[in-house]
């Protein structure tokens, strides 16, 4: 991959040098031919694969319900008419994606400078402690499926993916600079035996651009079928905006630094977001569906306005967190254990691990429907302010029984249980979330719902515990 010539105007990266886009009519016609040629080239190289960590094939995607492309089944359909109709729909989808790609690549943007030129200015000392350019002024490189991901991100920083192309990564991509990936809904697959796909390491000094900080992925779809490693392993600032993860048998995001997930979707994953010790995690407006461990927090986390459905564990809290305005429905079918506090406990949908020095999480304005909750002993008092526990069972450890305050919650169908002792005669060996197998002691519980429920004959529901400042 050669460094582009910044003096040539109107030439888009990823295209041939003889494709100027100065004339709008010639621009559109030229880009149509180039898009068709690129599609034909990537289609012919799909069998052999691209070198240097990248490869793929442009395909039409009719848009399945889960958002990830699957190959059409040639045996599906019982008549030639059905097969012809299906083929027509696929061709229409392919034409739409090609037109969308052409429209995105032919738009005019106020882009004026390449990332390599900014690095040259920074090395000369002209951009020290100075934000001279903005995100919209940095030129975008349209990456082709045969290009090397690591080389493209390190050279251009701002990279866009073609929505009519399926990208395939075949080796680990090491990112040590500021990077911004504009996905445009493109699908990225993995064909590698490496344990990590994107290794976001500590960044070196470089030029500052307004609107770019750390590593950012925007609107990318990751189809991780058959991949058992980590999609992201980050020790720097990582931002995921509208990213889609599906069928990841490993870890989607493993962060040792600062990670922000906004509007992301996790479907059928083993571990969604994992925040290691001393990490800072922010999760907003994300969807978790049929995951084993949606979120694992060992550091600090802010979890706001998310939705979870049929997860074995929506939140395994080993550190501290602020959990507000989330909706969690249903529980998955699993008998996993957790040994985070030294005792083997059955994993619940909301699982707060006991700790002698850490405080309780802030738990407010959450909706729980047909869920289970485990509360280990912590410092202070746990008060789930204005939360709805609809058909939810809460299991409290012995020391946590006296540290929970259930005033101000919607408790019509809640069930509260206290662990009295553990029956050693009913011990069973179960798999643990740490990867090993442990002996799980069966807890003998006591129903204490009426003892802890608020006395509604003495306390009116019209008090301020159920009101908020934004109500009329």
Swiss-Prot record:
Molecular-function annotations in GO: ubiquitin-like ligase-substrate adaptor activity
User: Where Phosphoserine occurs along the chain?
Assistant: 468-469
Which stretches does the entry tag as region Disordered?
Answer: 1-90
Write out the biased-composition intervals (Gly residues).
Answer: 45-57
Keywords assigned: Early protein, Host cytoplasm, Host nucleus, Host-virus interaction, Modulation of host cell apoptosis by virus, Phosphoprotein
Q: State the InterPro entries in the record.
A: Adeno_E1B_55K_N, Adeno_E1B_55kDa, Pectin_lyase_fold/virulence
Q: Per the record, where are the segments of Low complexity compositional bias?
A: 32-44
Report which superkingdom the organism of origin falls in: Viruses
Q: What is its main location?
A: host cell
**Does the record bear Electron transport in its keywords?**
no
Q: SUPFAM superfamilies in the record, alphabetically?
A: Pectin lyase-like
**One GO CC term on file:** host cell nucleus
Sum up the protein's function in the record's words.
Plays a major role to prevent cellular inhibition of viral genome replication. Assembles an SCF-like E3 ubiquitin ligase complex based on the cellular proteins ELOB, ELOC, CUL5 and RBX1, in cooperation with viral E4orf6. This viral RING-type ligase ubiquitinates cellular substrates and targets them to proteasomal degradation: TP53/p53, LIG4, MRE11-RAD50-NBS1 (MRN) complex, ITGA3, DAXX and BLM. E1B-55K probably acts as the substrate-specific adapter of the SCF-like E3 ubiquitin ligase complex.
Q: Which family does it belong to?
A: Belongs to the adenoviridae E1B 55 kDa protein family.
What is the protein's quaternary organization?
A: Interacts with host PML-4 and PML-5; this interaction promotes efficient subnuclear targeting of E1B-55K to PML nuclear bodies. Interacts with E4-ORF3 protein. Interacts with E4-ORF6 protein.
For domains, the record's comment is: Contains a PML interaction motif that allows the subnuclear PML localization.
Name this polypeptide is given: E1B 55 kDa protein
Task: List the source organism.
Answer: Human adenovirus F serotype 41 (HAdV-41)
Q: What is the lineage of its organism?
A: Viruses, Varidnaviria, Bamfordvirae, Preplasmiviricota, Tectiliviricetes
